[in-house]
UniProtKB/Swiss-Prot annotation:
EC number of this enzyme: 3.1.11.6
Keyword terms: Cytoplasm, Exonuclease, Hydrolase, Nuclease
Protein name (Swiss-Prot/TrEMBL): Exodeoxyribonuclease 7 small subunit
GO biological process, one term: DNA catabolic process
GO CC annotations, alphabetized: cytosol; exodeoxyribonuclease VII complex
Gene that this polypeptide is encoded by: xseB
Amino acid sequence: MKKNAPKSFEEALSRLESLTQAMQGEMPLEDALAAYQEGNELVIYCQTKLAQVEQKLQVLDADGLKELNLESDE
């Protein structure tokens, strides 16, 4: 992330939601491309943070080392 790197996962997610809403409206092509690029960087940031948290959870559960299932059965 180059400029304005998010300080947290929640901040990145909030920015992604804002970009998504903006792109659903009327937006000049150049702005849409910039928003898409920023969104892609934010997705990578969020995926990295989630992978780090998953890894930490596995370490914390070292006694039984169960696989983490983040999907609900609902």
